[in-house]
Amino acid sequence: MPNVVVVGAQWGDEGKGKIVDLLTQYADVVVRFQGGNNAGHTLVVGGEKTVLHLIPSGILHPGKSCVIGNGVVIDPEVLVLEIDRLKAKGALKDDGQLVVSLDAHVIMPWHKAIDVAREQAMGEGKIGTTGRGIGPTYEDKVARRGLRIRDLLDEARLARKVKERAALAREELARLGAKLELDEPALVKRYAELGRRVAGYATDVSIWLHRALQQGKSLLFEGAQGTMLDVDHGTYPFVTSSNTVAGNAVVGCGLGPTAVDYVLGISKAYSTRVGGGPYPTELKDETGERLRKLGGEYGATTGRPRRTGWLDALALRYAVRVNGLSGIAMTKLDVLTGFDTVKIAVGYRLDGKVLDEMPSDPEVIERCTPVYEELPGWTEKLEHLRTWDDLPPRARAYVKRVEELAGVKVVGCSVGADRGETILVENPFLAR
């Protein structure tokens, strides 16, 4: 069995969790390699909804191992809460089902305080952070002053690092006109207790995964957010604080690039975005609101309404290039049922010219207007369909046109929220 990376091909919220949940049956191990609890995966299995923010989606499959890699930033309060909820459901047992990297960095209370204070200070220039401390935690990681999971397991070391870092945080918050109310001894005790709660799951993930590969096990790497939010390749500065592209999958868990055999990009049949930043196909009219309502486009983590728009073929083609996508899975195709026409942006108009590739400068993207290609819509319900040939001809034509514009095969379509409401044309785990 090959090893497969699943990444978002848009601005996040593409439905990666559902596709990972579907593909987990073919993998032995599911690996989360970046991001934090700013991501939310909503899974519906047998009509029951489960929302996960840190633990990989594959945890709902008995007999599978789930790994949180060194590239993830962890709020231990959230991690322990998810562990407790999954245990209560009987979905998590203490048998090696969950593995957490000792080297994953820890989100501390000052990271959240700094995140919120900075966003408030930016006024109209807000990036749209979730306020969960993700960015400041990654900053501390790069500045070599962060705390890691392993630090929670040594209370004396934890106390020393908390004292050093809290002092710096107070200085920064004072410059932002904010204060950090912190009882350091109580904080150390609380985080040491959280450390004891996760100690049984914590290990050297690089060694653990290397041994899994030696045993012939197959890996499924689960990305968070999306390509257009990548800190290097997204619409900077309106991005997240980590690399969301496929190349980071192995970096974020301690393996080499030869561990990856197939890269699957997830794209909605339309598009959405949360927070600020350029979004050429955004619809601020009744059509946009219709997409929002039909698609349930409200954040799994924040609950805030998502911006909505037509599919952007330039952005999708960009995602194909920077991820080296082997195939695309299209989600929420059913949401487009009932539209008289459906549109795809096939170019951008800028200063009297038509561009066929997405500009690298977000300020230039802001000045672009989309050039649309219109296709006839369909009225048939899709939720009960299970094969490609069952799809209405117009829905098939839409998918094939997206495939042509993206330059890579659409290997699956989601036609409903439940795990089973999916048409898989080509299984990435059986593609080689």
Curated annotation (Swiss-Prot):
Protein location: Cytoplasm
Entry keyword DNA repair: no
Pfam families: Adenylsucc_synt
Pathway in which this enzyme or protein is active: Purine metabolism; AMP biosynthesis via de novo pathway; AMP from IMP: step 1/2
Reactions catalysed, as given in the entry: IMP + L-aspartate + GTP = N(6)-(1,2-dicarboxyethyl)-AMP + GDP + phosphate + 2 H(+)
Cofactor binding note of this UniProt entry: Binds 1 Mg(2+) ion per subunit.
Binding site for Mg(2+): 13, 40
Biological-process GO terms, alphabetical: 'de novo' AMP biosynthetic process; IMP metabolic process
Chain sites annotated for binding GTP: 12-18, 40-42, 306, 332-334, 414-416
Keywords: Cytoplasm, GTP-binding, Ligase, Magnesium, Metal-binding, Nucleotide-binding, Purine biosynthesis
First-tier enzyme category under EC: ligase
SUPFAM superfamilies the record matches: P-loop containing nucleoside triphosphate hydrolases
SMART domains: Adenylsucc_synt
Listed cofactors: Mg(2+)
Binding-site list for substrate: 300-306
Entry EC no(s): 6.3.4.4
Active site (record annotation): 13 (proton acceptor), 41 (proton donor)
Gene Ontology MF annotations: adenylosuccinate synthase activity; GTP binding; magnesium ion binding
GO cellular component, one term: cytoplasm
Top-level taxon of origin: Bacteria
Binding annotation for IMP: 13-16, 38-41, 130, 144, 225, 240, 304
Family: Belongs to the adenylosuccinate synthetase family.
Biological function: Plays an important role in the de novo pathway of purine nucleotide biosynthesis. Catalyzes the first committed step in the biosynthesis of AMP from IMP.
Subunit organization: Homodimer.
The protein's name: Adenylosuccinate synthetase
Organism, scientific name: Anaeromyxobacter dehalogenans (strain 2CP-1 / ATCC BAA-258)
Organism placement in taxonomy: Bacteria, Pseudomonadati, Myxococcota, Myxococcia, Myxococcales
Gene encoding the protein: purA
